[in-house]
Amino acid sequence: MITLTNIKKTYNKGTVQALNDISFSVEKGELFGLIGPDGAGKTSLFRILTTLLLPDAGQATVDGCDVIKDYRQIRNRVGYMPGRFSLYQDLTVEENLNFFATVFGTTIKENYDLIKDIYQQIEPFKDRRAGKLSGGMKQKLALSCALIHKPSVLFLDEPTTGVDVVSRKEFWAMLKKLKQEGITILVSTPYMDEANLCDRIALVQKGDILSIDKPAGVVSSFPGELYAVRAANTHLLLQDVRSYPGTATCFAFGDALHVTFSSEAKDLKDYLHSKGHMDVSIVKIDPTIEDCFIHLLK
């Protein structure tokens, strides 16, 4: 459904690399996630796939259409929800939806079944201007507008950034329903916890793909054992654990340190006690996708 082969993109006359030889494919009906921080290249990739930006090199197709030669067909077949709210803020909810339906030669009534579950949540506010909606409602309106012409592929660029936790959960529940309708979804997010909600993910950093697999596959590839180390003074603990001779990696995760060791750490507690930490907890834990991402950055 989506294929990319050796896609490259640079800015500022080649001095800034956005995408470096990117290749992967997304199957029909798949919910595929691009996971990475700001500046990883996710938006550049979305803009290329939605025919808004030309790659410097490589080939890409969407629903069997080339992103350069067949850009008109692609624009009729895809729905795109950019990271920044881009609807007309001075138009009402209903006016925005009617506008996008008209642009694609359809009506709200014709494809209402597809957007029904989403639109019903904002329909009571259909006469409210889009600029006056909450963050969660703006996202639901933007998703409705992206779906109104019944696209075969949906591109969502960081759709839950800046949205409250409840709205984030609701949004991903909506994506699961859309997947059941047979729509192929490519979604990007900086939130590592959302990666587990995708069928497959690509971990992206500075224009490079670090790993592509199912979320469980990414986690299972983590080498060695991972431990959570806690004590009262986390800042001092971080310095002391990193200075321990057997420490391989050590990163702060909330109130704990996630640590791997290059050799057995039987005397770590004694070492930390000698540094003044009296309430040390060392527990073996399962790695998360975020742990795997940090490991791959080394």
Where are these regions (language model features)?
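ABC transporter nucleotide-binding domains
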Residues: 9-187, 192-197, 201-204, 211
